[in-house]
UniProtKB/Swiss-Prot annotation:
ATP binds at residues 627-634, 1244-1251. The keyword Transmembrane helix applies. The chain crosses the membrane at residues 21-41, 77-97, 119-138, 150-170, 187-207, 255-277, 297-317, 368-388, 392-412, 481-501, 520-540, 868-888, 912-932, 1004-1024, 1026-1046, 1116-1136, 1147-1167. It is found in: Cell membrane. Residues 259-541, 974-1173 form the ABC transmembrane type-1 domain. This is ABC-type transporter FGSG_00046. It is a multi-pass membrane protein. InterPro entries: AAA+_ATPase, ABC1_TM_dom, ABC1_TM_sf, ABC_transporter-like_ATP-bd, ABC_transporter-like_CS, ABC_transporter_C-like, ABCC_6TM_D2, P-loop_NTPase.
Amino acid sequence: MDNTIGPRVDPSIRAFDFTALFEECFLDILPWSLFLLMLLVRLKFLLNRPKIIRVDRLCLIKEALWTLYAVVKLAQLILWASIAAFTTAGTVPAAALAFVGCMGGSVLSYFEHCRSRRPSSLLGILTLLILLCDVTRVRTMWLMDQPRAISILTTAALPINILLLVFESLTKTAVANEKEASRSKEEIVGILNRSVFWWLNSLFILGRKHVLHMGNLPRVDSKVLTSYAAPKVYERWESKPQSLMLQSLQAYPMTLLRGGLCRLFTALFVTSQPLLLKRTIRWFSEPSTPVSDAEGYGLIGAYLVVYGGRAVFTALAQHQNYRLITMIRASLVSLIYDRTLTLDLVEAKESAALTLMSTDVERIGQGLQFVHEIWATPAEFGVAIFLLQREVALGSLAPVIIIIVAIVGTVLLSMKIDPHQKEWIGAIERRIGSTTDMLRNMRGVKMSGFEDALTSILQAMRVEEVNISRATKLLFIGCQVFSTATATISPVLGFTIYVLMQRAQGKPGLASSSAFTSLSLFSILSSSVYIFLTSVPAIFSGISCFARVENYLVSENITGPTDAEGQDSEASSISAEKISIIAPKIAPSDYLLVIRDGSVRWKGQEKAVLSQINLCIEQGSFCVISGSVGSGKSSLLYAILGEASLKADTFHISTTSIAYCQQSPWLPDISVKECVLNGRDWDEDLYKRVIHACALSEDLAQLSAGDHTKVGYEGGTLSGGQRQRVALARALYSRRRLLLLDDTFSALDPKTEKSVSGNLFSSSGLLRELGTTVICTTGKPGNSNKYADYTLDLNKEGEAQLRNTQKDMQDDEIEASTYSREQNGPKKQEEDANHESNQSPETSQEHELAQESVPTFSSMIFYLRSTGMGFFALSFSLSLVYSFWQNFPTIWVNLWTQHDAKHPYGDLAKYIGVYILCAVLALVTHTVVTWFVNMACNGIDGAAVRAGPTRDTPENSGTASITGRGYVVFTNKHRAPMSYFESVDIGTITNHFSQDMEKVDLEIPLTGVQALFAFTSALVQLVMLSIGTKWMAITFPFIIAILAIIQRQYLKTSRQLRLLDLEAKSPLYSHFTETLSGLATIRAFGTHKQCQSINTERLDCSQGPFYLLYCAQRWLTLVLNLVIGAMAILMMGVTIKLRGSTGAGYIGLAFVNLTTFSQSIQSLLTWWTMMEASIGAVHRVQQFEKETPQEDVLGQVTSPPHSWPKAGLIELKELSASYLSSVSPVLRNVTFTVQPGQKVGICGRTGSGKTSLILCLQRMIKINSGSILIDGLNTSHVPAKTLRERLICIPQDALIFNGTVRLNLDPQSSFTDKQLQDNLRRVELWDLISSKGGLDATMQDGLLSHGQLQLFCLSRVLQKKSPIVILDEVSSSADEESQRLISKIIREDFKDRTVISIAHRLQQIADFDIILVFSQGQLVEQGSPEDLLGRDVSLFQDLFSQQDK
């Protein structure tokens, strides 16, 4: 009998065993043959790789073990050959193959050790597989009647195999180079280690013992980082830019394939469970015999294989899936950023990039979670229906029909998701764009008193977004109802059809084995269908987001200047004849820039901004472009840069080496030194010369950390003049051939402007020495104009005239300070003589972030209180009711089969009727809970947002949903002091408004309700497990204790990873936001690669916790599934002992509930892990509500009378102030009084404290000592928001945000359209704006120039009533005509009001009543203009006289 293929040997020979020939063929020959084939392929690959690991003790031990193993196999071969009587046809070939395989294993082990960074996967699988096979072979050997020597040798091979398995799985440490030593643990451990996620244990130990932060977080697999993942998609996209989704999936074929194979094995194990259950019930019903008892123990092994295999392969399939998600995330974010760098400036204002890289990429990831479910689950329910047909015959048609209806319904609903989701994401996009605008301009928002107005606008946008989201959520709910219907209705209809058919045919009714096997199949069927129908809308949503990203990537790039025929004009294409038309006396080679008959227009505008432009610029010359406000000066520079459309008969530029200073300086949030270096190599001498030339030495000396001081977001820690000069220093340090300056001196005081102009443009100036060609725009006569070689005059009609400028290059006495190469820079730079790097030290905040309390149970309580504990109690109760009705039918079926066995078809109507009632009640309660949680939260959300800003007080706690409450908390950030916004990364706040709101708004209701269903179902199923096998109830306390230990181990680390995941995204968002605001500068300097490098670095930083959190979740999936497997094995063991003492129905009941319990746990894990990040977002809401500082301290402020201020009297007494308590004062002992109606001008060098004084008046910086009184009331006792609303203030930088002209003019909706039009007419802008759409026109780049924007902001306050008007350089970008208009408005419209105006153009304040002169934070002069100008020594006189020169 042993010489047959069997597979089972005759029980009379050996009980429950395979034949010897079967074992030799399938447990020896097959695995060794496959190994030898794969050995050849692997060796060919390894021979082409370099040696990266040294031969060490581990290598020698493995070689020794393989040699010993080969010796044992050789001895077996010799013995078998010598005793032919005990062999079969396969004995000698099997032994020979094993010997050859051991020799091959020895060779492969050596090469794998030396040329692969991780232990051999092939040898790891081989040793494990051979070990399992040999265990079976050893048992057979000892049962067979043969020489003991063979059995002894076979047994002796087992410990050697075990040692090989251990040593072949050990991590290698003798690395040959530093690169390999820096690999992550996942990259260097073996396949068995990776399969059970053993490598993650060190992370959990670290998370339990220490606080996780970015500094101690383990490295992640390099293949999920941007440097590896992004090029895979980028190369495919560049070669074939279509179907981004397919390109992304095809870029990682092995990851996709490995995930698919693991999912296939999972499906095999899942569909094996009903067959195993059927065999168990039949075995339980059979009489006890030695053979059947042996089979019982064999069933324990079967449960070990099925449940253990399912646990491992489920975790591996999900792990490969989430690796795919992580890699696609890296590639998409990188692609979006790269595309953003080529984005048109007008499109950049729409903030699509932020939404795409956050919301859309997140939803793509959510859809990709189900990428293998879309094919695997249909396969599962196909197999389940086939097996079901064998049990209930035509009863299997019921689930088929229901599945078809559910799938068709779900697909139809999912197809409708796309347009609704696009509308929803569009609303999110608009909200995030407006929110980002508000945050970027928070200083201007506060100074203008628009905090509440803009917050109300944001809240209205939030309400609109919530309302738009309802349609999408309803469609998701509909899909869930279809999937639930399969689970609730299929079993009852299937059993009803089967029983009625059986009765009609006179056959036996419902048997216990068929009933519970069918229930198990129905459970698998419903679970598979549920996952499939859940995955369909998620995948459709992901496809929709892929399409949005794809549309963004293929949108039109910026177009450079073109000639009249539309062909790109290269430097080599210009002809001497064309140049000679404009400048016949100069050789063409002398020109750096030539434009002939050029016209400039912005995208989306038909009318040209400039026309008939003729311009010839010699190399090394200095050209000034002058013109009135709105004449197109900046547009011409943008056209030269390629940002605006330039068409010309001739366009020639002989260099791409361009530096650019835009009118509103763009400075990333890094140190001053890093801004100046801009990624270039350190040159100490040049750096000192540049700092001195830009007159920054004195400014840097006053900063707390010198040139290592961070400039803040958009240069918020610097004054306007300092920002312009730092940007200028960056341009000078770049040493470019062409320098474009867009009104760069507008914020400089006359003395500083004169000094900088001389240092740069005089005959011995730095730019003259470097031979740099300069084109500078200006709207006013200035010190730089007299150095110009050419002047291009632009008029309001967009026409230009080029003329030579008569220059007097004689330097006067003041110009003695002109740039000198030997002049020393600031002392701070002297300390850096040995500086070798352009990177300054930065203080990491990661550890501080990580030390924040992580989300705990209190976060969930916070969420539940926000939605209302009654709301949660009702939801939980209804969910428990659903779970009962969903699971009670298993008990009912057991009662039915017992009754049917005694009374065939007795009380059939009762059993069918109750079953139908249970199904209907389950479906109804499920639908109610799903709708209630999703839509009721949505309704509460809108109400909470409309309720407006609130703090958490006993009166309102628990009255609003976390979604609405969270947004209110975030919008309340405008109540924080300005120092908060200057110290907090704007990306962090943007992250709150995008990621956190996305998670709290969408994910918690959708995933939370599913997790709730799974949790209550698991509770009910545990009870039913104890009903099936009462002895199992004894183990429940131990199981619960084990689960509690696992939960504690997991949550301690996962909470911190969730927080790090959210925090690590903030710098990424900040960089996106900074890039969008500085596109023109980035492209002008050509620092694309530097910006891409920063993006890659920050993206990789966020990939770490993002990926590790997914890995930790897979570890939890594996461990809990192994616990369920242990429960199944334990239950089978209990079943063996209970055999004959209980009915088979109860055993079936127990195992069915174990199957459903495992599905509930799997579902709970799936939905809970999806909800984890949302819980982290809830925690952040909780933290920010608690920790965000407030400007007003309760009890220290009181609301002033409604009529305050009435007169406009301002008194400052011994005032000292600083931006932060740790920083030296910016104002020192300032004392003065302004009488009602007086006009006060403030002047002084840039950085002298002028703007700081205005900020003090508005309580925007910290007052250290002294007081400010307005109409006798101390402003420190007035709520800051109220104070700013009662004053009129126009900040230095024009405050413009996304929206219409009407919204920008009147955010508070206080005036009629006619009043707004009259205001625009007063500043002479109405004709221009009305021609572009009037009040409904959208504010965008190109609509108004910088000077016109200042006039626009002035028109905004003309109708506002307040006795005090504060103006911060409102004419800095205005031409002379506009300055006269502004002066007229101040004299006429504000004649009875107190006016405080900062000005660098001193003519603007020459007719004011009082002049205040500041220097280094102190008031050094005050008096009337006449008095100060008449003094022998006067700083004001000095400034005034330098401006006139």
